[in-house]
């Protein structure tokens, strides 16, 4: 069983594109979460140089197309979380790699980092928004999140894993029971707790740690995390 989420990554104000890419990929490939890089794989890129390679592809895209949209998406992250005790780190990495390959149709470079530091094993799949030919960008289409979840379900079934059943509107999840559907608020809450475990010096540092995980901070009368 795997719950998925598709996150569009943007360049943060005050930081270069290369810095933003490095922040996001460094968090995903954190040795403390991947057993010193044991559970990292890649497609058409080198994990140690992925930020530089992604950044170089943006320059090549600009050279070829002369297009540089404001607020452009620099990369996408697929968060894929598995039910505790159902999968090994090795198989989770395989499922993540297949998900990245089939969702991008093999047209975009990506890394897969499998985090094993929590009860539920989960993948961070980061793929370049620019394609391998550096002449097109991945476009987040309508219902892409639904398409991603269905693809993940298919791959899970192919691996003999369970999938998230469709629950009836009237159903309620009892406290203490593992939910059939992983609540996105629970995922966000855990990510915030993970950031707090790193003991940020202040609120600004906490927001920076959340941005490194792929969240976008919206400024206004009230700050929001998306």
What is the meaning of each model-derived region?
Residues 1-226:
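N-terminal nicking endonuclease/strand-transfer module with a His-rich metal-binding environment
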């Amino acid at each position: 069983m795997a719950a998925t989420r598709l996150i569009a990554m943007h360049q943060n104000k005050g930081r270069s594109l290369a810095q933003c890419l490095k922040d996001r990929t460094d968090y995903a490939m954190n040795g403390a979460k991947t057993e010193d890089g044991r559970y990292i794989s890649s497609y058409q890129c080198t994990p140690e140089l992925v930020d530089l390679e992604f950044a170089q592809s943006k320059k090549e895209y600009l050279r070829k197309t002369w297009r540089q949209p404001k607020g452009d998406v620099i990369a996408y992250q697929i968060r894929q979380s598995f039910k505790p005790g159902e999968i090994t780190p090795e198989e989770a990495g395989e499922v993540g790699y297949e998900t990245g390959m089939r969702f991008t149709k093999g047209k975009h470079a990506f890394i897969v980092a499998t985090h094993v530091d929590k009860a539920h094993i989960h993948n961070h799949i980061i793929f370049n928004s620019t394609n391998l030919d550096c002449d097109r960008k991945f476009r987040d289409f309508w219902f892409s999140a639904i398409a991603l979840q269905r693809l993940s379900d298919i791959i899970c079934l192919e691996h003999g894993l369970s999938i998230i059943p469709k629950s009836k509107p009237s159903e309620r999840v009892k406290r203490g029971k593992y939910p059939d559907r992983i609540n996105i608020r629970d995922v966000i809450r855990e990510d915030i707790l993970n950031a707090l475990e790193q003991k940020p010096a202040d609120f600004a540092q906490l927001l920076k740690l959340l941005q490194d995980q792929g969240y976008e901070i919206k400024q206004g009368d009230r700050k929001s995390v998306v």
